[in-house]
Structure formats: C-alpha cells, structure tokens
Amino acid sequence: MNAPVDVTAVRIETERLILRAWRETDLADFYEYARVEGVGEMAGWNHHQSMEESRRILDSFISGKKTFALEWKENGKVIGSLGLEPRDAGLPEELQGREIGYVLSRDYWGRGLMPEAVKAVIDYCFQELSFDYLTCGHFDYNDRSRRVVEKSGFRLLKRVVTSTARGVDEPGKLYVLYNPVKHTDKEKQPCLN
C-alpha cells in the first residue's frame, strides 16, 4: 500500500545537498537540466522542449507534494529531483511504502550525489515516516541508476516492464529495501536474491 507523503515542509541536509520542496523560483534550474538530451530519457521521459513544459511539470511537483528538489549546497542551484512515487509492488497490502525515483543533471553525474541523496531519503522514510519498505527501479539500459540502487542496499524484487512517459514499454528491474527496525527476519521478506 502507498504510504501518505507530503514533503512541503521537509528539509534534509547531506554533506553536499539540501533536499527540499520545489519552488516556482526553481524553474530556470529545472529547465536547464531537463532540456538536456539523455537526462530525462534515463528516467523514462523525453527531455523538455520548452520552459513552458518545465513549468507545467514543476507545478505538478509543487502540487503533488511528493518530490524533493536537490539543491547543490555550493551554489544553491537545483540539480535534480527525487520523488516518492506510488507504486503497486505486489507486496502485502498491510505494508506501507513508496517508490523512489530520481533524476540528476548530467553536469553532476559520477560524483556520488544520487547515492548520498537516496540514503538521506531512506533514513527519512524509515525513521521519520516509519515506512515498512521502499522500492526503486531502473531500466535495463541505465547502468548508472543500477549502481545507485545497489549502493543503497536494495535487493532485487522482480523484473518489470514499465510504460514510460515516452510511450514505450521498457524492461527493467524493481528492487526493495525493508525498514530494518520493523522487518528483521530477512527469510520472510519477498525478494529474488
């Protein structure tokens, strides 16, 4: 079952990032990375063609209250997003959780920023929101995302085919991470590995 989420008043700091709610003033930064070919495509959406397209999606981030802006501490620039999306992972109904989805500006790839952000959100979801689990996935062609998932401690749950915003069904893998405080018996946790 999808746990309730509202990140409007949440602020999480890591060594190099601030995770916070999106603001209308983030539009230029958002468009700057979302318009780059290959960035959105790794997450299943087409790169943005206009500032207006980015504005519509930014408005949905703000009203949806489930997506963090990733702000680079060094200069205050928004360089990515991390959302807590609803997903039917096929886990028992009594368990509460969400799926982590993320995108990072190509200029910041290869610096270990996304594992840093994901770890902070895992801690927040398990310690503050008391989620039972989180899921996270990647498309087969996205090795960078696979490495983030693996570094973050997720375990393979199942192979999936996802209908993307690009109108394409993409094969991939879905992983799960159980809250270690609530679920200590690993033998009873549904996983493939």
Task: Tell me the role of every PLM-derived stretch.
Residues M1-E41, T67, E71-N193:
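Acyl-donor (CoA/ACP) binding surface of acyl/acetyltransferases
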Residues G38-D59:
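Conserved GNAT-fold acetyl-CoA-binding loop/helix
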Residues F61-S63:
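Soluble sensory domains of the PAS superfamily and closely related sensory modules
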